[in-house]
């Protein structure tokens, strides 16, 4: 009897072959991932004046949506081809390998950033950074127990909640590919079921057993945007047409959702324009529809509209993405895990610098640019290491000759030796 994994492998090889466009890395993907890395840095620097002007201040969706959507697209490139060429088991093994890397990245980043906060407290003679800034008092109240829970992902610290969500989304890929081998509509049913569980029934995971705090990024809800990106890059979801009516509709959505977002100039805080215009009641009414934790429908709509406009703006195939700035963004976007981890550290380090230097215009600008420069340096350094410069490079002619000999049939090579 043929085993289920073998059937899945055959189905994957025969029916899940990626579209041609999924085989080539899309320059738009790297560009927008790079942009997202800088926005995430700026957004996470405590009390950062620059954070008042990031895209999240003008609508419901933000850089987290961009990060997860692009991660879904990148996962389709990195893993989808393995499922198609090598079968389900090898594809699942490839996903497990990446999940293992991200798991240790999560654990390591927490240890390093907390060490930075402890060092800052010792230097200043306070408990400000561990207690007030990072809210680690519950963690230190039961260090031994919480370290065990940290390792088992049953304790998710504040500031460190996106990688655990990403881990579970990665773990869903083998399930999604198995369903797609049967029928792609099963994938849609699976993802929508998870989304309904999160948004309608409030199903979520516990981030802190001591307080009952839930995961800030509920993977059941965020699977929708992740696998939307995954589906686009696999060719399961067709690219939208360039249509003036769609452009107008997307613009209308983006503009219409700016006031209800109650951010920046429409702030619903006391004295803000939003409060005087009565937008605060509308904001509270739409809160569940805009849920960041469960990925509410208005958030999804806003991101799709924004993404469509950005897709149109860069031109077909990203042809308008040229020049040194674009290349810099792409280089950063090609090393997102390393850059993201550096951003977690630098956001806290930059916040400390602003605490000590002040938050004037000049110092804020200098500190933000310093943090961005570090991310760029990390991207280039990691890229250099990945190129394995210590390996001996074979001359091009020798490489071509070797490749030609490997393509020559063994019988022809034997005949050549005899002759």
Give the ranges of each region predicted by the language model:
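Alpha-helical transmembrane segments and their immediate juxtamembrane cytosolic regions
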Residues: 2-419
């Amino acid at each position: 009897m043929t085993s289920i994994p073998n059937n899945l492998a055959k189905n994957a090889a025969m029916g899940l072959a990626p579209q041609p466009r999924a085989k080539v890395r899309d320059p738009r993907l790297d560009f927008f991932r790079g942009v997202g890395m800088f926005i995430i840095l700026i957004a996470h620097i405590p009390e950062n004046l620059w954070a008042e002007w990031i895209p999240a201040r003008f609508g419901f969706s933000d850089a987290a949506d961009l990060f997860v959507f692009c991660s879904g697209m990148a996962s389709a490139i990195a893993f989808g081809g393995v499922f198609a060429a090598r079968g389900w088991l090898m594809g699942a093994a490839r996903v497990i390998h990446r999940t293992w890397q991200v798991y240790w990245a999560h654990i390591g980043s927490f240890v390093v950033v907390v060490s930075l906060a402890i060092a800052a407290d010792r230097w200043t003679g306070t408990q400000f950074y561990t207690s007030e800034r990072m809210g680690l008092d519950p963690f230190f109240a039961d260090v031994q127990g919480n370290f065990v829970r940290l390792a088992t992902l049953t304790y998710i610290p504040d500031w460190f909640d996106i990688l655990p969500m990403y881990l579970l989304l990665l773990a869903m890929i083998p399930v999604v590919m198995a369903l797609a081998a049967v029928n792609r509509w099963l994938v849609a049913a699976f993802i929508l079921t998870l989304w309904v569980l999160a948004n309608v029934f409030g199903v979520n995971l516990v981030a802190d057993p001591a307080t009952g705090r839930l995961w800030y990024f509920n993977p059941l809800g965020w699977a929708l945007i992740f696998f939307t990106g995954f589906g686009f890059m696999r060719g399961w979801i067709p690219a939208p047409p360039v249509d003036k009516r769609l452009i107008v509709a997307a613009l209308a959505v983006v503009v219409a959702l700016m006031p209800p977002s109650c951010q920046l100039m429409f702030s619903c805080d006391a004295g803000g324009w939003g409060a005087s215009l009565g937008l605060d009641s509308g904001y509270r009414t739409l809160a569940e529809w805009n849920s960041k934790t469960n990925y509410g429908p208005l958030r999804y709509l806003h991101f799709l509209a924004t993404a469509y406009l950005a897709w149109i703006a860069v031109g077909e195939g990203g042809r308008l993405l040229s020049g040194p700035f674009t290349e810099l963004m792409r280089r950063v976007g090609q090393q997102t895990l390393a850059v993201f981890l550096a951003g977690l550290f630098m956001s806290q380090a930059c916040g400390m610098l602003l605490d000590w230097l002040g938050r004037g215009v000049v110092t804020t600008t200098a500190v933000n640019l310093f943090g961005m420069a570090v991310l760029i340096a990390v991207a280039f350094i990691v890229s250099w290491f990945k190129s394995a410069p210590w390996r001996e490079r074979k001359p091009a002619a020798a490489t071509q000759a070797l490749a030609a000999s490997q393509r020559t049939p063994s019988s022809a090579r034997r005949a050549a030796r005899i002759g």
